[in-house]
């Protein structure tokens, strides 16, 4: 893996291929390896970069998180993630880059576009579970508060079951999300990673400060992506709302919420039609 030294962290990332830079931002998994099957499909067209977000995988922290980062309204980590991606983009290219964020990674991508538009050539938001600008935002914020409370008091299994039911996660995705790692060490790491995400992201990222105006001023750069196998899920409804209010196009892409793993060839074909 490659390394970028940043304030308070060493950011690790996979890099394959040649051509214009395309950065993938992972969601709850936090690590870029989930994008490697997709990267193989794109490496003849792009320099594909798949990041281990700060606090995840091989990326190393040189300073502890502030205590306030677990506050439900804290934007510390999502803003730090966005700054990391912007600094990575600048280190890799003198030109604006392509960026795709998936799930909570797409919320990070939104903050990159909002705060560092100069690094973005084109950007895609794949099934973002953000609720800030929705008419029923308070309802969804309360639901996420309840989910995190259940995880912390009744256990991860019950809380994640409620999470899947509340967001109407498709069966193809629920099966993959609940699949345990192959080794005991892997299962322990998987548990720690999911608990960290529960404490520091479910509430904070989904209710972070993004508005529809943040999209309209850069609408020519944005594509919304919805999976063909995850119809009816909450993240898809978010994209439909953005589309209705701003006119930014939605493109159907193969697979579900984890389509880049489930159907990497078809996923890549859509990206190449968009950006190739």
From Swiss-Prot:
What's a GO cellular component annotated to this UniProt protein? membrane
Task: Return the Pfam families for the record.
Answer: Abhydrolase_1 (PF00561)
Q: What EC number(s) would the UniProt record show?
A: 3.-.-.-
Supply the enzyme class, top level.
hydrolase
User: One GO molecular-function annotation for this sequence?
Assistant: hydrolase activity
**Segments forming domain AB hydrolase-1:** 20-137
Protein family according to the UniProt entry: Belongs to the AB hydrolase superfamily.
User: What is the recorded name of this protein?
Assistant: Uncharacterized hydrolase SAR2661
- Species annotation: Staphylococcus aureus (strain MRSA252)
């Amino acid at each position: 893996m490659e390394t970028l030294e940043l304030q308070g962290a060493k950011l690790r990332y996979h890099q394959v291929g040649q051509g214009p830079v395309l950065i993938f931002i992972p969601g709850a998994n936090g690590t870029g390896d989930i994008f490697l099957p997709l990267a193989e499909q794109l490496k003849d067209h792009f320099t594909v970069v798949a990041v281990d977000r700060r606090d995840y995988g091989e990326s190393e922290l040189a300073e502890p998180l502030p205590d306030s980062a677990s506050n439900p309204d804290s934007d510390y980590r999502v803003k730090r993630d966005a700054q990391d991606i912007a600094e990575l983009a600048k280190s890799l290219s003198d030109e604006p880059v392509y960026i795709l964020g998936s799930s909570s990674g797409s919320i990070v991508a939104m903050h990159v576009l909002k705060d560092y538009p100069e690094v973005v050539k084109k950007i895609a938001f794949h099934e973002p579970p953000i609720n800030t600008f929705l008419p029923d935002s308070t309802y969804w914020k309360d639901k996420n508060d309840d989910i995190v409370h259940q995880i912390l008091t009744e256990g991860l299994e019950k809380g994640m079951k409620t999470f899947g039911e509340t967001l109407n996660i498709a069966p193809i995705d629920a099966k993959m999300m609940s699949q345990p790692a192959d080794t005991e060490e892997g299962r322990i790491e998987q548990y720690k990673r999911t608990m960290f995400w529960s404490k520091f992201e479910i509430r904070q990222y989904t209710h972070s400060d993004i508005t529809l105006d943040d999209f309209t001023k850069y609408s020519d750069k944005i594509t919304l992506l919805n999976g063909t196998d995850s119809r009816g899920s909450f993240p898809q409804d978010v994209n439909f709302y953005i589309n209705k209010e701003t006119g930014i196009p939605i493109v159907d892409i193969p697979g579900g919420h984890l389509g880049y793993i489930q159907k990497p060839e078809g996923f890549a074909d859509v990206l190449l039609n968009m950006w190739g």
